[in-house]
Amino acid sequence: MNSITMQLQADKLIRMALEEDITSEDVSTNAVMPTNVKGTVDLIAKEDGVIAGMDVYARVFKLMDESMEIEMFCHDGDEVKKGDLMAKVTGDIRVLLSGERVALNYLQRMSGIATYTRSVVKLLEGSGVTLLDTRKTTPNCRVFEKYAVRVGGGCNHRYNLSDGVLLKDNHIGAAGSITKAIQMAKAYAPFVRKIEIETETLEQVAEAVEAGADIIMLDNMTPEVMKQAVALIDGRAQTECSGNITKENIARIREIGVDFVSSGALTHSAPILDISMKNLHAV
């Protein structure tokens, strides 16, 4: 785990996940498995994809029993093929069985996001457009999901509400206008913070430019209107395209000339990558 934020938060969140799943005991495992029996199990890819979350997977077992041994044959960012042996985990069989679901949930989810993100990044190659995620993440899993986006080749937008100013339609409504919202943000936020504002029409784009926005989000615009907006902005602000952007329609953004494209689908719609723990046996 390369992110300092992830290192600080991971153990706490993993413990919460284990407590949610195991609570007082794993009655199924404890009913059929005596204590202190050592075993080993294989981690196997059941489909092609990009791996993210190997350290999180390993950490689940280490938090349950520090003596657990994890031998990894792939690492975050690697592309695996169906049938590839990804790791071997050795230790108390009760720990292997009780921690399996939580460990796989993290690994499958994170690898699914990394796989989906990389496929979208490839569609944008050569365009100069930077792919961003959003805050549309699973509660208490943002640190893992945004990390997976980076593994897949995307970039993180704001991690939380303190990371930057993004004035959306309801902020504008509360302030009274785009101009007033930007003026208030400039007066409140530190000067090093960029001011981004959401626009839906060319009239709003023009107002945002005149008010001095640093980044102008072009939200739910057609490709034709976005082209007009980029021409209207004419380099006076950075541009971000947003609104129902998916792998299926992102290719239309390539030639428009925006700087960024943000997609909530990277985290809220990426399917999991099918990964399994198989061949458990005593050693």
Each language-model region and where it sits:
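Acidic/glycine-rich phosphate/pyrophosphate-binding loops and surrounding catalytic core
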Residues: 2-211, 215, 224-232, 238-240, ...
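Short secondary-structure boundary segments
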Residues: 220, 243, 264-265
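Short acidic, glycine/proline-enriched helix-loop-strand junctions
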Residues: 235-238, 280-283
